[in-house]
Amino acid sequence: MHSSLKTMAPAKLERLCVLSFFLFCATVFGTESLESLPEDKLILRGLKFYGFHGVLPEERELGGLFIVDINLWLSLKKAIESDNLADTVSFADTFRLVKKIVEGPPRNLYETVADDIASEMLETFPKINVIRVKFGKPNPSLVNSTVDFLGAELFRKRNH
């Protein structure tokens, strides 16, 4: 039987991805934080903004399209029970905060922009326990190269 990822059954591949994620979390956050990792998550995927981030003069002058994906781990129990927006983190407020940062003052490094987003999200929304931010540029123009995406992905945990 062939065991490559291309021939692996989707359910088996999904279990492998989940296991890999938990092993990653154990490495980054320590095993004790796996017990406290909330199982609820809000997802914002494919947020698109125009910004002027990067180290090249062309990036600073012409700007470019940036894509942001965000996962927010928090307890959604109260929000589910109340069906009240005040008991969760608003997608609209999250979008506005990310837009302000990405369309704001230019940064040299994508890592810095991702960290700015994660830090401000944790500061602004106390309900968030863990955040994942993926920030980058689709189809960047590199000399003699074709690349689908360049970026940085960060995980941050609230310090209680």
From Swiss-Prot:
Q: Which gene encodes it?
A: FOLB3
> Which keywords appear in this protein's UniProt record, sorted alphabetically?
Folate biosynthesis, Lyase
Q: What is the protein's quaternary organization?
A: Homooctamer. Forms a hollow cylinder assembled from two ring-shaped tetramers.
User: Which positions does UniProt annotate for substrate binding?
Assistant: E59, F91, Y110, E111
Q: Which SMART domains match?
A: FolB
Species this chain originates from: Arabidopsis thaliana (Mouse-ear cress)
Q: Name one GO molecular function term.
A: dihydroneopterin aldolase activity
Function as written in the Swiss-Prot or TrEMBL entry: Catalyzes the conversion of 7,8-dihydroneopterin into 6-hydroxymethyl-7,8-dihydropterin, a biosynthetic precursor of the vitamin tetrahydrofolate. Can use L-threo-dihydroneopterin and D-erythro-dihydroneopterin as substrates for the formation of 6-hydroxymethyldihydropterin, but it can also catalyze the epimerization of carbon 2' of dihydroneopterin and dihydromonapterin.
What is the protein's given name?
Answer: Probable dihydroneopterin aldolase 3
Q: Which InterPro entries match?
A: Dihydroneopterin_aldolase, FolB_dom, GTP-CH-I_C/QueF
Which tissues does it occur in?
Answer: Expressed at very low levels in siliques.
Pathway annotation from the record: Cofactor biosynthesis; tetrahydrofolate biosynthesis; 2-amino-4-hydroxy-6-hydroxymethyl-7,8-dihydropteridine diphosphate from 7,8-dihydroneopterin triphosphate: step 3/4
Give the E.C. number(s): 4.1.2.25
Q: Which reaction does it catalyse?
A: 7,8-dihydroneopterin = 6-hydroxymethyl-7,8-dihydropterin + glycolaldehyde
Where does the record place the catalytic residues?
A: K137
Q: Which domain of life is it from?
A: Eukaryota
Recorded family membership: Belongs to the DHNA family.
**PANTHER family (UniProt xref):** DIHYDRONEOPTERIN ALDOLASE 1-RELATED
